[in-house]
Amino acid sequence: MRKITTAAVIALAASAVAEDLKESLAPKLQRIIGLQADVGPLHPVLQNLYPVAVVDGDRFLIFDLDESKTGYRFLKEAPVPMPMPKGVRAAFPLEALDNRSACVVSPEVFDSARGYVTIFHEFVHCRQWETVEPALKGRLSIYRQAMEAGDYMWELSYPFPYENAEFAEDYPAALDRMDRGDGPEALRIRARLKDLLGPENYEYLCWQEWKEGFARYLENAMLRHLDMEENHGGLALPLTRVAFYEGGSRFIAFLEGRENGLTLNLETLFERIADPSGEAAGNSIRPTGPSPTTH
């Protein structure tokens, strides 16, 4: 009987803590609405809001837009599908939401203005998933191979040759040429990197530049608008996957400068990243079918 009583007390205490957290989060979620009114005009993608799943131990506290779309309300609790790292900042489909994509964060993200910008970074990924990501991804040979092998974490675990000395030198060099306005030389270096990497590694590079680079591109647009320091981390040696956040962002800015309005169509943006000449990038990368836009 004592064990049952103790268990009941623990359960009640946990429930009370969860209720306190939900209550404290409610006004913080509403600030997302206010920020969107400020940053939404920067790009059509930022005009979309998505569910927010806050990690509380081994469960999600899921908030979604109310019926009026003018505020967030608590929707439900759900078990986390896998252990969540401390300070998680992510976006992925949730079974509890019938596979709708959600921003997944830990509670301290709401403690700073930059944290709210991070939420919108993750909303960009939600928009990618909601529009063209599944179709684009399905045309990548590296994705098909990963699915055949049951490797669902391939985007994080892909064995990209970051340590290759030529790549580590030329990738930042191409970005530097873009920044200096020397587009032809930047694209020559880029073409050399494509040959160096081979088809599969090049697919991975382009995928990460499109997915994470575009989110970083809009993240920095928001930070500039809010008079906050931009995020340009990722190119310090040794290079890691985060290099493609910064590299992708700068490459996208370069491409947008050559083709105004390019970022308004996510599929075309991917095509240009894969082949800046505007020609077909090869069957393994170039998507087919309709071209959903970000609107």
Regions found by a protein language model. Give the residues of each.
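Sec-dependent signal peptide recognition
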Residues: R2-V9
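Hydrophobic h-region of N-terminal signal peptides that target proteins for export
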Residues: V9-A18
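N-terminal mature-domain "stem" immediately C-terminal to a signal peptide or N-terminal signal-anchor/transmembrane
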Residues: E19-A78, V109, A215
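Catalytic zinc-binding patch centered on the HExxH motif and its immediate surroundings
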Residues: T70-N99, D111
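Short pre-active-site segment immediately N-terminal to the catalytic Zn-binding motif
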Residues: V104-I119
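Active-site recognition of the HExxH zinc-binding catalytic motif
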Residues: V117-E130
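Post-HExxH zinc-binding segment in Zn-dependent metallohydrolases
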Residues: E130-E230, E259
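Pan-zinc metallopeptidase signature
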Residues: I189-H295
